[in-house]
Amino acid sequence: MSLLTINKLTPSVGAEVVGLVPDQLATDDALGAAVLDALEDNGVLVFPALHLDPVAQVQFCRRLGEVDHSSDGHHGVAGIYPVTLDKSKNASAAYLRATFDWHIDGCTPTGGEYPQKATVLSAVAVARRGGETEFASSYGAYDQLTDDEKERLARLRVVHSLEASQRRVTPDPTPGELERWRARPTHEHPLVWTHASGRRSLVLGASADYVVGMDPDEGRALLAELLARATTGDKVYAHSWSVGDTVIWDNRGVLHRAAPYDETEPRLMLRTTVLGDEPIQ
């Protein structure tokens, strides 16, 4: 018998999990394994009105893998990072504007870290208008290619950079901004990610700068076309937040972005990230 009661939200990505209480997620190892299996099948899991407190959120994530502590210090609970445009709550809020574009977390690490396995967000305060989080399957993006496209794209490699993602929201950066962006190393990844499971996905999104060996404009046009095909309305689940909602997604197989909202709105999400254990290859 399944440990999770799941209702599909769209045919392509997303499912709602009902009937759980926070203590179950925080303490039940078998439930953690069931969540990972459900993520593989659905990409995104929504726990409506769960009201998972920060300590329990970190405990839950420990049942899925190793918790990322690289951003500790922004919140009183280690492993929690406040996602907000309010600089009084997050000194690095300016960088979060890039999350309004489709992306996969972890394509431009500071070192050799792998992309994150999963990300959890819990809603503390929500915007009155906008601020949804949208998801699209990067596995689905690959599966929907023609055989000829799969063969051609399998040979391509793409350079990803922090500068590429930041220029989308700050097209005329100051010298200081450029210096900070370029201090982060660029990373070259295959366009097609062959996962340990045998599944394949496309590595797309805001950090994808150019295709190696292609004319820059032609390469960027190809990346834009693939992203547009992957994120048409029928392939997207948009989560409209309510206070107390918790959402987890498979970062390795799902593109995501935040819908724009008024920066004066007190939108606040608490994020915990589960570290990855699989390189893009």
Label each region the model flagged.
Residues S2-I248, R252-Q281:
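Fe(II)/2-oxoglutarate oxygenase catalytic core
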